[in-house]
Structure formats: C-alpha cells, structure tokens
Amino acid sequence: MSSVATIKRNIVPPHLEVKGGRPLSGILKVSGAKNSSLALMAAALLTKEKLLIQNVPQLTDIEVMSEILRNLGAKLTKTNNSIEINSESIHNVELPYELVHSLRASFFCVGPLLTRLGEAKIPLPGGCNIGARPVDEHINGLKALGAEVEVINDVVKAKVSTKDKRLLGANITLKYPSVGATETILMASCLASGKTTISNPAREPEIQDLAKMLNSMGAKVFGAGTKRITILGVESLNGTSHCVIPDRIEAGTFLIAAAITRSPLIIGPVIPNHLSAVISKLKECGCSISQHGNHHLKIIPREISGVDITTSPFPGFPTDLQAPFMSLMATAKGSSKIKERVFEKRMQHVLELNKMGACIYLENNTAYIKGVKELVGSNVEGGDLRSSAAIILACLSAKGNSIFTGLEHLDRGYEKLEEKLTNAGSNISRKFDQITSHSSFSNKIISEDNIDTQKNAA
C-alpha cells in the first residue's frame, strides 16, 4: 500500500509585518542625509589626501557607492557611521554597469574623474523608477567646462583634451535647478582653471553641505543655497573631516508619522529651516510644532484637516515627501489635492493606499483625495523608496495587520527604520518566514508544487 501527499508552500520575499493602530511616543532619531552623503563620497575623489565623513547612514545606496569608489581604486575604512576614504591611488576611469544601473548618484563620480584622471566612462545611471531623469544638464555643464562628452550605446564617455588636462571655468545657466547637475558641475569646477558661475542652480541643503565640505578641502565656492553659485578654481584640494547634515526627508517622514498616528513625538536632530515648507503644511492641517532644545522638534497632532500641496524644488515642498504626505491626507478630515511637478511617475503609492481603503482619484500628476475615517490593514507593496515610506506610514495608522513587501526600496534610504519605529512604540517586524494563506500576494509568491512525500507499507 502506498500514499502520496502533496505539499504546497507559498514563499514570500523578506517583508515587514505591521500591526497598525498603535500610538507612538518618545523620540525618533534622524540619521545623516543619504543624498548628501552620496555626493560627499564622490567628492572624496577630488583629493589625494584622506577624507573622513561622519554621520553617514548605513544604507544599501551607501554600500553601492562604496563599491564604486573601491572599483575606481579608492580605499575605504568604515567604523559605525564614519567612512574614511583614501583616493590617492585611483586609476580606473570606467564605472561598471552592474553597480551604476541601480544608483543614479554614481554619475557624481564623472566630474572628479575628469579633474583627476582626465577621462571618465559611465553607463547611464539608474535609481528609483519615478520618471525621466535625464543627465542632459550634467553633460551640458561638463561640455561648457571644456570636456568632450559623447553618449554611445547608453555609455557616457568624457575626456579633457587641454594640454594641462584641466577643465576651464565657464558661465553656466541651468534650464532647471537640478540637484544632480548642480553637484556635478560644482565638483568638476573646483579644480578647473579660472572662474565658474552657475545660474539657476539647485538650492537644496545638500548643495550647501557639499559646498561646505569642498571649502574645508580648500575649494573656493561662494553662494551655495542662493540663485547663483561662484567657484574660483584652485590647483588642488586637501583632505578634511566633515559631519553630514541630518536627513531632512527622514525627519519629514517622521513628522508625518506622528501626524498620521495622531501621536506627540520628538524628532531630531533636525535643521528646522530645511523643513520650512513641510512644517508649514503640517501646521496648516492641524499640528502644533515647536522647537525642543537646540536640535529637535516637538510635534503634537490635533484634528487633521485636508490641505493642498504642490511639489517644487527647494525651498518648496519636497517631492520626496509627496507620497508620505498623501498617506496623511488619506485619513484627514475633508478633501485635498496633491500636485506632483518634479517627477511624472511618482504616484505609484496611490493604488496601494486605495487597497487599504483610501479614496484617491488620480488624474495625470494630480491626486484628488477624500479623507476617510480609517485605513484598513492589507497586503501591500512598495514600488520605489518614497512610495514605500508612504505605505509604511499608512500601515502604522491602519486598523488591523498589514504585510509590506519592497524592503529593497526602504533599505536604500531609511536606516534601521523598523528598529526606530519599534523603539517609539509601533509593532513592526522584519520577517523571512514562509506564508501560506495570503492569496493577494499572487504576483510575488513563489509556489513550490510537487513536493511529494511517499510512504510505502507492506
């Protein structure tokens, strides 16, 4: 006699389990700015001396940039949240596709490579799929500085052909205040011959942080954070030690977490004027926000009402907080409208929020939101970094349990997120186990069929 038993196992990728509806309390610690850290790490290529960068968050994007620098010949030593970079022996001018395709900030290396080695080759970079983010402005800026640049088969090839292998100062006007283009031109022009001006540059705090470190290395950068940046080229740059500014996007996410869970919280360290637009909108929708000590903010949410926002470059409302703010508006009293003006594909969270009971209608890049009393836990998935953060906030406030997949996105930009939220009172945990009953994961589950166990009996 024999019998055959078939076991079917549904295997879910690493995910977060969130038991929603719990208030938060205490302090949420803000890490160093990811976007600033990436540019600062690339800037280490500009000097032959050692550079120490402190308050660097431990993220997958930072790991990718670290591997890129090692591939170019730099030596890195990491201790907790500090990175020492020695670029004295860089020799490789070509960045590998397998690293570049996942990190848009990899393009920051082009300017330093041109100034140090006179040449750079890089595949067109990747990053979050949130719409077209061409590097045209970066390339035009490098060309204005005297570099010869061509794009062949999606590979950017740049070189300096002057006798002394130095770029030449120029007057550059950006069509759009691109952060990446501003940082690329800023780094490339520090060692250029002569004076460079950037009109209509990005004014983000990360630009100011980069300029501050470059100046401590011996560069001559003036006007960062204003509508015109002036750079006087120098012969060489020295090493330095620099502490990264707090991450304003993480801080904003935490402020919104307090609001959506209707929980008083202390957030910090922060630089308040980096968050002016966000603080203004949170106050408008019903939150009390005040300075708490020298480097923290205290937020006390009251009844949350719908308010309209439109994203724009700094000092406007940041596009990186559009998705988290939409989660808040989904549970606000009344209606609201959110218009995305920076990226055209940054509404991937709408479908997931509606799955949780939100009432959001999307028309092109404008979301029309009718607030509901509460969201309901569900199986949800993040499609990019900031939409993932928005969905996690929704899960925290929702009634019932949620399962979130998309950790690869969260780990790019939020350091130890579940640990921080758990310390503040949330019930959120990272899981790697198998799940057998969540059918709505159909597009993510790997089914193992035909696992047969045969038992033979005489």
Swiss-Prot record:
Keywords assigned by UniProt?
Answer: Cell cycle, Cell division, Cell shape, Cell wall biogenesis/degradation, Cytoplasm, Peptidoglycan synthesis, Pyruvate, Transferase
What GO molecular function annotations does the UniProt record carry, in alphabetical order? UDP-N-acetylglucosamine 1-carboxyvinyltransferase activity
Q: Which GO terms describe its cellular component?
A: cytoplasm
Residues reported to bind UDP-N-acetyl-alpha-D-glucosamine: R104, D320, V342
Named in its record, the pathway it takes part in is: Cell wall biogenesis; peptidoglycan biosynthesis
What HAMAP family does the record tag this protein with? Answer: MurA (MF_00111)
Q: What is this protein called?
A: UDP-N-acetylglucosamine 1-carboxyvinyltransferase
Protein species of origin: Prochlorococcus marinus (strain NATL2A)
Please name the taxonomic classification of the source. Answer: Bacteria, Bacillati, Cyanobacteriota, Cyanophyceae, Synechococcales
